């Protein structure tokens, strides 16, 4: 059986996360659902160029209320259809924090947070615990966890 995980991450990581996503799906019996792969943004290429927080914040100021609603609704629909959340949180973003919360409290699915500096933050620790997920200091440690669960392909 293939587990479906919502892949939460900041906008600045779109390209590097895509490489990891493909590697993970080839190595493990998981399907990573990347919210940036959908058509919620009018110009995905423009979004890929927003590699700094300053540029991203300036871009967000240009979004209409309708676009904001489309983004949030799309993300929540994806989350609802998943078995869990994998959140890359080394570059914390408001969106990823909301996805962690929604996964744990709204949809009651396991939340796995990968981050170096925040795994002991009360919100991260509690949401991972209450959801039945976990917090990991690296992607490698998360991969080791998936192997222990028997999700590695041989």
Residue map of PLM features:
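Conserved catalytic or regulatory cores that recognize and/or transform ribose-phosphate-containing ligands
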Residues: 1-154
């Amino acid at each position: 059986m293939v587990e479906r995980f919502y892949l939460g991450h900041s906008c600045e990581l779109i390209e590097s996360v895509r490489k990891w996503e493909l590697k993970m799906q080839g190595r493990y019996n998981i399907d990573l659902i990347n919210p940036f792969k959908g058509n919620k943004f009018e110009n995905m290429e423009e979004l890929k160029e927003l590699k700094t927080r300053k540029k991203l914040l300036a871009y967000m100021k240009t979004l209409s209320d309708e676009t904001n609603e489309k983004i949030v609704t799309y993300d929540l629909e994806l989350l609802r259809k998943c078995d869990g959340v994998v959140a890359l949180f080394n570059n914390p973003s408001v969106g990823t924090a909301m996805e962690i919360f929604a996964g744990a409290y709204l949809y009651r699915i396991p939340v796995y947070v990968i981050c170096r500096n925040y795994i002991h933050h009360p919100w991260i620790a509690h949401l991972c615990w209450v959801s039945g997920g976990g917090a990991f200091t690296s992607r490698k440690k998360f991969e080791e966890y998936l192997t222990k669960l028997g999700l590695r392909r041989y």
